[in-house]
Amino acid sequence: MVAFCAHSATLGLPTVLENVFRAQFASELPSFARHRTAIISRRPAYSRQFRSLSHNGFSLSQSISSSSSQSPATSQSQSKGNAHQSEVSIEDLTDNVTTSNSTSTPKDTPHTPPKASKTQKNSTGATEKNSRADNGLKATGPKPKRKKEGWQIQKDALKQKFREGWNPPKKLSPDALEGIRHLNAVAPDRFTTPVLAEQFRVSPEAIRRILKSKWRASEEELEDRRKRWERRHDRIWGHLSELGLRPKTKRTEPFADTNVLYDDRRKGSR
């Protein structure tokens, strides 16, 4: 029968782990003691919690010391239970410390000004709208009248003078004047003033003045007038022929605008 050796039992893996855990916990005990004294000086209410912690630590140290003489299986189970109890007690202690700090000494929160009520917001919005409306009225107010230019003054004067529009009097030829007098003398009932005005496209007042006029030109004046009207006719015909509206003729060729222009230049060069 094999005898049990106590020295060989201490060299097992569970025993080595117990010794390591005991050395680590022994090194952390001074820090726990300092933490306890600091908390007691600031918060006396935590003394009971630290007492329980010290009691648990003391019981844990006793259990570790007694576990060296026990069997490896029982010592390992007890060390695990004690370690779990110590961890639970430390977590409870830290939770209590944080809750007590949050309740007893509240943090300095920044002072926030009170929010404006809805009525104040509405009043401020109404004042802003009114100010904007006033600024808009000032900006879109009556602008100073600008001084009219010369062409604008002339245009207004023509509108007042010719309310029905610009309708210059038509210049009638001597033959047309003689024809008006002849028609009115032959059949005055048929060729009345409105009919003659519509036929010759002039105003009725112009027809009345032509019929009332008693002035008659002499033969020399009639001949001179006839020549002037022929030249006028040829000049207009030559202008229309250059535009392609009338055929060109030898009679109207000297009165064309091109010939008149180049003849003047030739005469000037000479």
Swiss-Prot record:
- State where composition is biased (Low complexity): 59-79
Localization terms from the record: Mitochondrion
Signal sequence span is none
Looking at the keywords, is Mitochondrion present? yes
Pfam families from the entry?
Answer: Neugrin
> GO CC terms for this protein?
mitochondrion; nucleus
Query: From which domain of life does this come?
Result: Eukaryota
| Principal subcellular localization | mitochondrion
> Where does this protein have compositionally biased stretches of type Polar residues?
117-128
UniProt keyword annotations, A-Z: Mitochondrion, Transit peptide
Note whether Mitochondrion occurs among the keywords.
yes
- Region Disordered, residue ranges: 59-152, 248-270
Q: What does the UniProt function comment say about this protein?
A: Required for respiratory activity and maintenance and expression of the mitochondrial genome.
The family this protein is said to belong to: Belongs to the RRG9 family.
What name appears for this protein in its UniProt entry?
Required for respiratory growth protein 9, mitochondrial
